[in-house]
């Protein structure tokens, strides 16, 4: 079997040299997608789908984070189970892709509007495939164990057939209908959008107070509105039946101030008696709440706004004008006719299109809907059953339940070219009659020009990836998927809709586990966005630091549901870790085996085995719960604190034996395998270079290490280890170097004196037993079973003075940070990320202060 070309460990660590040829090796051998020799051939694989990125550009740092998390999990499962299936793909991203393509065309002064539908579609397709290849190349640079042979695209011919078949099936079952109703309309993109594509933003507006005269009277009601242009479509006026001010007006008529039509005064408890004048105009054609009232009271539904954002013929002399231009002219008209009272500046939530950032207009339109209200109760039972699906972190279940409680039918049609064209047909002579089928019913029929919402096909992604109808056995093995990893901000757009579709079509969940991660924030804890120009290109990070460093930074800061702040220092720390790992590998590789002794294993070796077993079990427990920050830290702490700084250093200062050398290499091999899911490039290269016994052609074909069997008890090395750490800390406190010699006195008998003497010598410490010597002026270092005293006669005044100054500075920082954290206004008004950052800063100051104070106390 093909192996990777060996790399020279003698050279300095360089991420570009380490990564050279590795991706090609993985792609050509595809070892990740071959069953490992230890796996059960009849077992189901660990199956997972890659959230398909949009075809609108390049991968951003958020994609890199999501993919790094998935790859860590997939490689871990490969090492545990031996069989994985991770399907890649891209999303056609209807609105986003079409608008970006058309924007590029306008920049090039190309008139795409002259093209017929087919030409326009094909041009977008060609452009999108170029973008798709860019995304694919970027994904490969991260070193992902994807099954590229099964790559999917949401708008491929196969996907299109699947999506249209589903549409027909759900229509026949009564879950999809076409109805004339009030929808959210994007006047810039000229298409309907769904409720969750409307983003509420605080916006300052003018609240206009306008007179509505009563019929045959000089009396009038004052009505407040932010949208005076919609008065042309008013069909009633409402007051609250409990509002004493307006009792006498019940069931009277008022005159519409713009078109002079008579409209009734009706009553309903929905009316807010605290807002404006507490008299509400009812415009069902342009407001969702008014629309609900119109259904309740069977009112007429009028619309005075066109789909392009201009006013229609109902607006009389303002017909054809842009609604915002018309608004100003209408106010002037009302003022001139003495029907205008005043305006107030108010700030309120206004709905904006998530895609175009224009204010959404509620407009009456005939659209296709998935009637989710028919089955939402079943979905709620499903997501609340942990035997069906587990959500990490669990707190998001409350958010999901709240959304399901307020779920509305899903508008699935869009007025675009780029997408799955709806398979509905209309007779030329009877356009109100519709036939839903994949193929045309005949020459007298024309097809619906609308396409499906992008999220409709995205909701079918787990099925598109596995349900090809050809291999039922493979489908059953992979569906439901083992896991979905995605950001929490698309739970409603995508995750719940996948659950909707899987339940409707398969009466099943689409995945067993749902892992939600947060968002990538900048160094100031702000969300990355184009407007702030604070985005980070992952490819630039890879060029500078390497894919391993980027991946290690991202996964080492990942806790379920939490955001991550981009931090250059942490990337540097990740790169430093890799450099240390390289140097450790080089040291082990260069040990002169001809000088190894025949000494057997001792308490130090028993200790490192116990530590390895503890860490291995702990890491697996954390990985099962997707707590990558904790698992990565536990492994890195073991490698540096236990293996490198204690085990390797003590053996290096003593003398390596054959048994110790073999154990060191065995543990090194094992934690290389355990590190592999986080940093695949460097671990692949080192593994290949070492030529371990029974090694595989690739580290990905290895099995996750089991526990190392050991019959010996821990002996007393924990006490030895703790004493060594305290002596190292003592030397650091007194600014001593490791080579400086110390005398360590003790009175009580020590059962492990042989090993203690041996390993203290490596720290340049002489162990001396005493009987009656006075110890009052010496420094005490206590262990669980003994007291040791350090002989130190040097002047410590300078060290004490330095510590006093440092402690004073830290005390001021603790006080300052504590005042900020405990400030009620700061806690209430500051963004969560900013508050948590200050809290962490305080904790760091307090920890550093304690260390300095402890050091000072030891010197007194």
Curated annotation (Swiss-Prot):
Gene Ontology biological process terms from the UniProt entry: valyl-tRNA aminoacylation
Protein's UniProt keywords contain Coiled coil: yes
Coiled-coil annotated residue ranges, if any: 794-860
Gene Ontology molecular functions: aminoacyl-tRNA deacylase activity; ATP binding; valine-tRNA ligase activity
Major localization class: cytoplasm
PROSITE patterns associated with the record: AA_TRNA_LIGASE_I (PS00178)
Motif ('HIGH' region): 53-63
Keyword set, alphabetical order: Aminoacyl-tRNA synthetase, ATP-binding, Coiled coil, Cytoplasm, Ligase, Nucleotide-binding, Protein biosynthesis
Record text on subunit structure and interactions: Monomer.
Domain comment quoted from the record: ValRS has two distinct active sites: one for aminoacylation and one for editing. The misactivated threonine is translocated from the active site to the editing site. The C-terminal coiled-coil domain is crucial for aminoacylation activity.
Name assigned to this protein: Valine--tRNA ligase
Organism the protein comes from: Mycoplasmoides gallisepticum (strain R(low / passage 15 / clone 2))
Gene: valS
